[in-house]
């Protein structure tokens, strides 16, 4: 396999060597997994969860959890949203909440907001109302898997923009031993 990556040019200090601070809102499966991976990479994570039950279930993974309503401006203004490098709205079951939180994060001076959508129209609305990036997980995974399993020589694929991506491809036999 030949792995070609432009990550160093795109991301600067690649590999998680620069510690960043993340605000994760919602500790469902997606939020928990994201928080766990960020913590494992050495980043600072503060999570906000409205459900005490979910917060208790995640406390072994995410040591810093605030229990509160992320749509409440008074509550959110006490967190210091503008001090985080990024906020991730990891809620997906209630679009109105996701939209309200995204707008509130922008109003409170959040540097970069990532929100989660379950429909294309939600993605458009979030991008127009404060989200810097929108994760449409089901669509993104389906496209990635279709690309990966639909082509014999593509092992992995990450789309960077509409017409730019990073591919992990099979090495042609005639290239073996070449530099």
Feature names for model-found ranges:
Residues 7-179:
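Cytosolic regulatory regions of ion transport systems
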